[in-house]
Amino acid sequence: MWLAPGGVRQQGEGGQTRLKFWSFLFACCSLNLFPSSPLPLSANGLATVYHALAAQNVSPAPAPALRVDPKAQVLFDQVIQTLGGQAFLGFKTLTTRGRSFSITDEQTTGFVTFESQVEYPDKRRFAYGLGKKKPIVLINNGDQAWEVDRMGLTHQTPEQARRWKITNAYSLENLLRLRTREPGTLIQDAGSDFIQNLATRVLDISLANRVDVKLYLNKANPLPVRITYRVQDPKTLEWDEYADIYGDYQSFQGIQTPMHITRFFNDERISETFRSTAKYDEVFPASLFQPPEQ
């Protein structure tokens, strides 16, 4: 026998259920969990609710499981092994050098040489320029984004930072090593198609964040040929179409690395990157992904 909120004595299983409900309700009210509160719940608040639920033997809903149909699983495993197996899954950094072209209306509008240093999943330093001039440096570190040029330090524009976060999230490396392993992801065999005059197999990847990705694989290898995905613009609410074409794979440190990458935005080719060198697992100082001291 025990006292429920309000001093009402309860007995038996039904009374225990009512006690759990009122205890949970009280915890929610104490933490302002209802829609009348304009502020999001803090991490401490979430932890408190979790412990309150645990104390009442009420388990939070489990995260949705990763789902892969059997045909897709076989194909996905082949992709990982072809790219390098554990060497591909385990590398932490990638340094590349080469040339990059910007394209507008199918005409080349710019050309630079570059050095790119990436620490996965979300840090990069990209230095580009021409000749002996001091290069422009783009630095991204999670949600932070800076640009360093001959005039000094500034922040990247919000749109510039947003675009990089999107394309980085669904890059070959992050898609296959992170996104496809997130809870709630569904991977299905989507049949065959022709891309870049190549016969391909297609995997349809539906992510928990409601982004749909298509991964096109060369039937002969099977190396990734193309990745396409749609992301909604938060301002216009229009759906933007992104596509990356991967080619000229070469092996570096046991990892098959695409040396030619072409990017499309809403069906328009906007850039081509030709890598000349690639090196994995260089150790970078933390300061590499921070703005220089002024």
Model-predicted regions and their roles:
Residues I166-V202, P224-T228:
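Short, conserved active-site entrance elements at the starts or edges of catalytic domains
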Residues S23-S36:
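Bacterial N-terminal signal peptides
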Residues P60, L66-L153, P183-G191:
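N-terminal mature ectodomain segment of secretory-pathway/periplasmic proteins
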Residues W146-L176:
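Acidic/charged, solvent-exposed loop-and-adjacent secondary-structure segments enriched in E/D, K/R, S/T
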Residues A4-Q16:
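Intrinsically disordered, glycine-rich low-complexity segments
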Residues G131, S192, Q196-E293:
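Gly/Pro-enriched, hydrophobic low-complexity segments
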Residues L33-P60:
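Signal peptide processing junction and immediate N-terminal pro/mature segment
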